[in-house]
Amino acid sequence: MNFPEIYSATGMMELIQKIGFLPLLDSGIEGFSAEDIVAEDCGYVRLPEGGWDWPLWKWKGEIVQEMPCMYGKFFNKKAGFISQEWWPDFCNYRRSKFPRPDEESIEGAILSTLQSTGSLITRELRTACGFTGKGMRSKFDGYLTRLEMATYIVTEDFIYPRDKHNREYGWGWSLLNTPEELYGRDACKCERTPEESYQRIFEHLKVILPDASDKQIIKLIG
């Protein structure tokens, strides 16, 4: 499938709705990422006066808030979008591979903390879970990535600090939540078996990515 060149967040939302799955950056499949299909002037650029501009990066919050859709590290530990239509099958398959963590485990404690407090930005959740010492940030991020890959945690929005002129700056922080809290338990329910969900996703990706090998698609599904 030849993807149209995208010039706006609205155009990106329409594409995600149409194809169901879209990694943000390099997916390992040539041409299959939001970064690959945006117009050249929507890509990352360093500004002469310092700083940077990257329209695609700024669209993420608008996309997850307005579609809505799921966003998180779903594709080989890399971030991307999944439409609500395809989320139940994806969730069904992934959770069959990664059952809900035991509450006594570190992942279970992180998930329980988020469920009890409601949405938190990453650093707030990290502090609430006691990952405050030296080297704890990278360890916490590893646990968080596993929970996102297993579809238990998603990004609700992106929060940016503001300068003295009340302008947003920086890369922003992910506001984390559970998909059930965001959209209700029915959003994750699927009537198919995990095997049926996997096959449905595989066949769909074969249609939209005709030049990708089976190995590449299998790796993408996880």
Feature-to-residue mapping (PLM):
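Long, low-complexity intrinsically disordered regions
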Residues: 1-222
